[in-house]
Amino acid sequence: MKKVSNTTNVEYFDYKGLLDPLMANADQTKKNVILLTTGSFNPIHRMHLEILNIAYKHLLSSKEYNILCAFISPSADCYVKYKQPPLIPFELRCDMIQNAIGNFYQENKDKNGEKLKIYLNKWEGSHPYFIDFPDVIFEIQKQLDKLYGNITLLYVCGMDHYIKCAHGLGQNVIAIDRKPFKQGFGHDNLMEDHDRMIFLIRDDKSEPYSSTSIRDYYKKGDFENIKKSTFPDVFNMIIEFYDQNKNSFVKNFNYK
């Protein structure tokens, strides 16, 4: 892995303040893991958090792991602006992520069982240049090794991303296959290896939400499906931002 920054993760994220209490209460007979997902989150939708929850429940059921928490790492503006516009600025995307996490907790507060702790990690997106996900994984794992030495970072992604990119990591990956399932890429075709901590999970319950569909819904004036796709507080932020940036839709989507 290349060196991507002269700054450290610690300048953007208080690992010890967060993890010391979690490690103190962890069952030391189990493997300590932290989940990580990366992406544009332009904007964040329900599936971004749901894949973390699916991964969490899958690991929890094995009773072999302490799932300490999960990190969400949004990409820098310099990368996101070259994807489908309009670009939601980094700090606003971070605010949306925080609100999504808060709404996610509210919606699940009455459910029995343990809850996954989810935190925004701003290190990646705070840079003026793009940092690819393998380097994000490497840098965060390096900080965890330096501070603790016994925490494994597990990268959580969709099956599309796993097939295209993350399969090359070779270890420490949880891939979620959503409807419509990838033909020919099930558990029988891609090797699941618990020794190398590669987990392939088929999810047949979640809706196929996406950031692209949210932008398309706005273009069509379909606010009801935007509400279904994301969280209440995020919905209001999305509509306000898109209303203020309709020119981007006119230029790029022939907005009507």
Model-derived features with residue positions:
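Nucleotidyltransferase catalytic core that binds NTPs
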Residues: 1-256
